[in-house]
Amino acid sequence: MTKMLKRVLQDVLSEEENEQLISAFDQIGDIIIVRIPDSLISKKQIIGKTLLEQVSTANSVFYQSSPVEGDFRTRQLEVIAGENKTQTEYRENGCRFIVDVEKAFFSPRLSTERERIAGLVKDGEIVANMFGGVGMFSLLAAKDTACTVYNIDINPVAAQLCKENAQINKLKGEVISLNGDCLLYTSPSPRDKRQSRMPSSA
């Protein structure tokens, strides 16, 4: 969405300022998250207002003021336009997900990879999804496959959201949300598959 971001803001920023927009924005449900270079921090309110006006499906615009960091893989967000709420509903490949974009890790940019890996899971398999977050991969794997997925995350907010997401979706398989250190859960017993992608600090 980098080109779209530049196009949307071309009438409110100078050409030089527009060129400094080096990062795309993410839209998760009705929430937009944008990164703004230090040189344009003074323009963050007008950037947020313009995005809110131009993207009809958005109700909130947040500026990401820190990278993803810590054991819980969370980031600091500052509302710059619209509603100051960080929870929303996101849909992907036929599943509904309740996500909190500030309190639990989530990235819409991994959707293709999630779908690809979920397609490798077979009926009857047991899968340990380490760093499982709100259950994105886990629910996609169990949606049309009679498998059991243990979704493990050390972040209690992510674990609770995964539990809620498993309840609001119709699954052929089963997703079990576990809150804790994935190494403590997965070391003692074998699993047919382990999904252990650790998201980078985005």
What is each of the regions a protein language model found here?
Residues Y185-Q195:
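Conserved small/polar residues in nucleotide/adenosyl-binding loops
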Residues L13-I28, S42-R109:
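Non-catalytic substrate-recognition/targeting regions of SAM-dependent transferases
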Residues I32-L40:
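Carbohydrate-binding surface patches
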Residues T112-E113:
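Active-site glycine-rich loop that binds ribose-phosphate moieties when present
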Residues A118-D181:
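Conserved SAM/SAH cofactor-binding pocket of Class I
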